[in-house]
Amino acid sequence: MRPLRFLFTPVIKITASQNSTEICYNLPTSCRDIIQQKVLDMKKLIHSLFSLTVLVTLGVYAEPAKTWTRDEFQIRDPFVLPDGDTYYLYESKPWSGGKGVAVRTSKDLDHWTDKEMVLLLPPDVKNTAVWAPEVHKYDGAYWLFTTLTFDPVKPDAKDAPSYLKPIQPMLEQGFKGGNLQPRGVWVFRSKSPKGPFKPVKMGSVTPAEWMCLDGTLWVEDGVPWMVFCHEWCQTGNGRMMAAPMSKDLSRFTAEPIELFRAACIPGAGHVTDGPFLMKPKSSGLRMIWSNFLKGSGYCVLQCQSKSGKITGPWHMHTPLYTRDGGHGMIFQRHDGQMMLSLHQPNSKNERMKLYPLQVTWEGFSRCDWDPLGPGPRRVPNGRGTEKGVE
């Protein structure tokens, strides 16, 4: 007869939560050790698989984000905001279309992230173009100025939004206008340079009856001003305008004043574009703006205020850049070097170009040389130049 003890199969109970193995029947010590080791190995495998899942979820093994060099992406009117250790580059869809504004960031001005939207216009804003976005830090917030264009509004239109008005010609004798469309400078606010930006009002801050574009911010004696262009399409000869603003930048507090007109120097065209103001430490208030010059095409001009105030008078209109590029702005690199940013060529293949600027007693020195190449490059602070700006 077979011994009774062999009719029973030992039962092994494993309690994983207590990290122990309970043997219901006696087994040799070597068997218990083997089983316990297998349990520990299984736990380690499960823990490793769980950790791997978490790491993949967090993107540790994801491909690094793509960066772009300046010659790899199209952009018009490139506006750079240095903030902290980061440069912010704002852009809209070039030429026409678009429903908002995007930003790219960089640490070195050579390599830029992919663009992220910082402004999405409300669905009921039926614009046809978004132009020339720029962001200014003022009164503890970030303010985005951009130009919106709309389809023409008929005088008897009943379904047009209240912020759109018919545009009537205001042509000077001897000048021809262009296509008359509602166009104005809208202002948006955010707590961060990366948005989201929200409108300070529904509609343009510039007069609704005027075709206006390219608004920029200048603060003088604590008062914010908008400098903007009254379009040549409506006036014939483009006008550079300025108006003081309310503290929340939602309205003008006085009627706009005229600073100068496009055809203010020999050979100049009738376009006023892209004003930007700066006051170097040892000289007066200066402005750069864009027009067309005979024999040069689209260009950047510079001028200076005789009084040192925004109201001018403005004089010494001279070329700064004359190689079919324009709508410039000036910013200070992290090392203090002043830089000119513009788009070039003035076509649908435009790219952002950067040039170091030198300041002399008579204005910014010409910068018609080739743009900075790839990689870090520094321009020495030579005689007659300044790094600091107010």
What are the roles of these predicted feature ranges?
Residues S17-Q18, S30, S192:
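Short stretches within intrinsically disordered, low-complexity N-terminal or propeptide regions
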